[in-house]
């Protein structure tokens, strides 16, 4: 049985090839890309917080991730999402998409490129 399993293992690709292992070591040993991406998302989130302040909504910076949860004025997340789309050109998801607890919020993702976020800033006059 052991001989058979050794033969099966040899042909099943259970071993990661040496070049792939070396590439993984190189990719994981330098965290510069993590710092760059974290800073990029932080800047985008800060800009979105300012955009929301310009439309009269106070949104705290998140402790992690790249989403902002903005309270919907009057608790109307659908109406607020429409308002952001119509007045600012910003896409927001009504919080109820993500569970009942978010029903009076909208979720904003800081995934648009910097130039798109700058356009939002221009639209609200900041």
Per-range role (PLM):
Residues 12-15, 24, 47-48, 68-85:
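Accessory recognition modules or surfaces
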Residues 55-59, 91-96:
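A short linear hydrophobic-aromatic micro-motif
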Residues 83-92, 98-126:
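PLP-dependent enzyme catalytic core of the Aspartate aminotransferase-like
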């Amino acid at each position: 049985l052991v001989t058979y399993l050794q033969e099966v293992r040899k042909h099943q690709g259970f071993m990661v090839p040496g070049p792939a292992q070396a590439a993984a070591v190189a990719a994981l040993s330098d965290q510069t890309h993590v710092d760059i991406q974290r800073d990029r998302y932080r800047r985008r989130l800060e800009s979105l917080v300012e955009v929301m302040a310009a439309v009269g909504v106070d949104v705290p910076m998140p402790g992690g991730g790249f989403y902002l949860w903005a309270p919907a004025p009057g608790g109307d997340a659908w109406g607020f999402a429409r308002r952001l789309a119509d007045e600012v050109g910003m896409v927001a998801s009504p919080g109820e998409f993500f569970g009942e607890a978010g029903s009076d919020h909208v979720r904003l993702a800081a995934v648009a490129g910097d130039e798109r976020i700058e356009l939002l800033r221009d639209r609200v006059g900041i």
